[in-house]
Amino acid sequence: MKKFLTTAPVVAAIWFTLTAGILIEWNRFFPDLLFHPMG
């Protein structure tokens, strides 16, 4: 359990960084696809 508590925040930080990076890259190449439903 102690090992899980130390690895979970690290995995979460990496996951959020990857997700944010993918969204930023996707928005840079396909801005219309990302924002079209909201507009």
UniProtKB/Swiss-Prot annotation:
Gene3D superfamilies, per the entry: Single helix bin
Main location: membrane
UniProt-annotated location(s): Cellular thylakoid membrane
Gene Ontology CC, one term: plasma membrane-derived thylakoid membrane
InterPro entries the UniProt entry points to: PSI_PsaJ (IPR002615), PSI_PsaJ_sf (IPR036062)
PANTHER family (UniProt xref): PHOTOSYSTEM I REACTION CENTER SUBUNIT IX (PTHR36082:SF2), PTHR36082
NCBIfam families found in the cross-reference section: PRK02733.1
HAMAP family cross-referenced by the UniProt entry: PSI_PsaJ (MF_00522)
Protein name (database record): Photosystem I reaction center subunit IX
Organism listed in the record: Synechococcus sp. (strain CC9311)
Annotated gene: psaJ
